[in-house]
From Swiss-Prot:
It is found in: Cytoplasm; Membrane; Nucleus; Mitochondrion. One of its GO terms (molecular function) is ATP binding. InterPro entries: Kinase-like_dom_sf, MAP_kinase, MAP_kinase_CS, MAPK_JNK, Prot_kinase_dom, Ser/Thr_kinase_AS. Brain (at protein level). Expressed specifically in neurons of the hippocampus, cortex, cerebellum, brainstem, and spinal cord. Seems to be also found in testis, and very weakly in the heart. Dually phosphorylated on Thr-221 and Tyr-223 by MAP2K4 and MAP2K7, which activates the enzyme. MAP2K7 shows a strong preference for Thr-221 while MAP2K4 phosphorylates Tyr-223 preferentially. Weakly autophosphorylated on threonine and tyrosine residues in vitro. Palmitoylation regulates subcellular location and axonal development. Activated by threonine and tyrosine phosphorylation by two dual specificity kinases, MAP2K4 and MAP2K7. MAP2K7 phosphorylates MAPK10 on Thr-221 causing a conformational change and a large increase in Vmax for the enzyme. MAP2K4 then phosphorylates Tyr-223 resulting in a further increase in Vmax. Inhibited by dual specificity phosphatases, such as DUSP1. Inhibited by HDAC9. The keyword Protein biosynthesis does not apply. ATP binds at I70, G71, S72, G73, A74, Q75, G76, I77, V78, K93. It is a lipid-anchor. Serine/threonine-protein kinase involved in various processes such as neuronal proliferation, differentiation, migration and programmed cell death. Extracellular stimuli such as pro-inflammatory cytokines or physical stress stimulate the stress-activated protein kinase/c-Jun N-terminal kinase (SAP/JNK) signaling pathway. In this cascade, two dual specificity kinases MAP2K4/MKK4 and MAP2K7/MKK7 phosphorylate and activate MAPK10/JNK3. This is Mitogen-activated protein kinase 10.
Length: 464
């Protein structure tokens, strides 16, 4: 099964349909009708309206206007909208069939809980969550309202970035990852399509549906992220720690430099071959850590010496050196050489990457050392429930949010300037976009493949 994402570079025409449901029994007398109407009038009549968006119907609060579809994926459909209460543009994600099965329900619960807990400038902010249904029995739709960004990293990768922008984007990626790691959350699904940016070079990480607390190592599955960005320990089924995210950042950085995917494997085997052809066959010490069957296969592959990093990433691929003495090709290449290390034990940590000369020019303790998120459900990833039990848990979360956010704001954050989608320019398609549209679902966690928000592109402006 493939995922197909929709791109809208110009304003689409929508067939907008306003639907108010009444549903009375024609045999009931007038007094009964009046009583029924007064007592059972749906929330939809008072607060909501419905809009046809492609093959889906969005039933949203009236405060959200001018809905425009901007993306779709395995986990839902995303629309841009104007929030009349906050006077800003937002993204509204309708979760796709969240109660289809236990895996969908668990993922929906996990995403909702994590988004409510995490509060960092480099992680997408949850502004609101709601459902148009008024009872648990009717409950079937979940809408997440988030910040609206200008583009995803797929589009930015095709741009000629100078060292300042490249370094600043990487710094923000690492800040967001460190914040997640501080709560024991390993993202595991980092890729260009779930990292979004604004025209002022602000970067945010999306999606926590695949995030899993670090303590569940004994149940780790190798089928977690888009293949091109999978770390060797994931490909080889070794288990993983925080360094799995550093490998993904290295792959993204390398793609920024080369403007093409570093390791475009067609399968796990091909992916491993692509890695060792460029980086070399790992040492026997690493091989000893592998399971016997995997080790037997890996040791019987052709041996590769690998290429040096100056050959993998020659100066000609980098932008001209910055006036800043640390933002140079040599420093960028050194960082790549520390991130793209097959053995996770020898791979650079997030903390050390943030101290690297190519990155620490932006170092701000308030961003790097932000208080860790408090995950109130400590058994988030160990929970196992029936679909109905998951449904009740999610319903309680939504009702709790609605109660706390009568004015529609879950996290009290200032409205960023320039939040509108900039769709006046169209960027070349990214190689990573091709990855998304043709991505096969290996034995993922039952549709735990991708739910990225695909935003319209806008040019990157100046860094701070």
């Amino acid at each position: 099964m493939s995922l197909h994402f929709l791109y809208y570079c110009s304003e689409p025409t929508l067939d907008v349909k306003i639907a108010f449901c009444q549903g009375f029994d024609k045999h009931v007398d007038v007094s009964s009708i009046a009583k029924h109407y007064n007592m059972s009038k749906s929330k939809v009549d008072n607060q909501f309206y419905s809009v046809e968006v492609g093959d889906s119907t969005f039933t949203v609060l009236k405060r959200y206007q001018n809905l425009k579809p901007i993306g779709s994926g395995a986990q839902g459909i995303v629309c841009a909208a104007y929030d009349a209460v906050l006077d800003r543009n937002v993204a509204i994600k309708k979760l796709s069939r969240p109660f289809q099965n236990q895996t969908h329900a668990k993922r929906a619960y996990r995403e909702l809980v994590l988004m409510k807990c995490v509060n960092h400038k480099n992680i997408i902010s949850l502004l609101n969550v709601f459902t148009p249904q008024k009872t648990l029995e009717e409950f079937q739709d979940v809408y997440l309202v988030m910040e609206l960004m200008d583009a995803n990293l797929c589009q930015v990768i095709q741009m000629e970035l100078d060292h300042e922008r490249m370094s600043y984007l990487l710094y923000q990626m690492l800040c967001g990852i460190k914040h997640l790691h501080s709560a024991g959350i390993i993202h595991r699904d980092l890729k260009p399509s779930n990292i979004v940016v604004k025209s002022d070079c602000t970067l945010k990480i999306l999606d926590f549906g695949l995030a899993r607390t670090a303590g569940t190592s004994f149940m780790m599955t190798p089928y977690v992220v888009t293949r091109y960005y999978r770390a060797p320990e994931v490909i080889l089924g070794m288990g993983y720690k925080e360094n799995v995210d550093i490998w993904s950042v290295g792959c993204i950085m390398g793609e920024m430099v080369r403007h093409k995917i570093l390791f475009p494997g067609r399968s796990y085997i091909d992916q491993w071959n692509k890695v060792i052809e460029q980086l070399g066959t790992p040492c026997p010490e690493f091989m000893k850590k592998l399971q016997p069957t995997v080790r037997n296969y890996v040791e019987n592959r052709p041996k590769y010496a690998g290429l040096t990093f100056p050959k993998l990433f020659p100066d000609s691929l980098f932008p001209a050196d910055s006036e800043h003495n640390k933002l140079k090709a040599s420093q960028a290449r050194d960082l790549l050489s520390k991130m793209l290390v097959i053995d996770p034990v020898k791979r650079i940590s997030v903390d050390d990457a943030l101290q690297h000369p190519y990155i620490n020019v932006w170092y701000d303790p308030a961003e790097v050392e932000a208080p860790p998120p408090q995950i109130y459900d400590k058994q988030l990833d160990e929970r196992e429930h029936t679909i109905e039990e998951w449904k009740e848990l999610i319903y309680k979360e939504v009702m709790n949010s609605e109660e706390k956010t009568k004015n529609g704001v879950v996290k009290s954050q200032p409205s960023p300037s320039g939040a509108a989608v900039n769709s006046s320019e169209s960027l070349p398609p990214s190689s990573a976009v091709n990855d998304i549209s043709s991505m096969s679902t290996d034995q993922t966690l039952a549709s735990d493949t991708d739910s990225s928000l695909e935003a319209s592109a806008g040019p990157l402006g100046c860094c701070r």
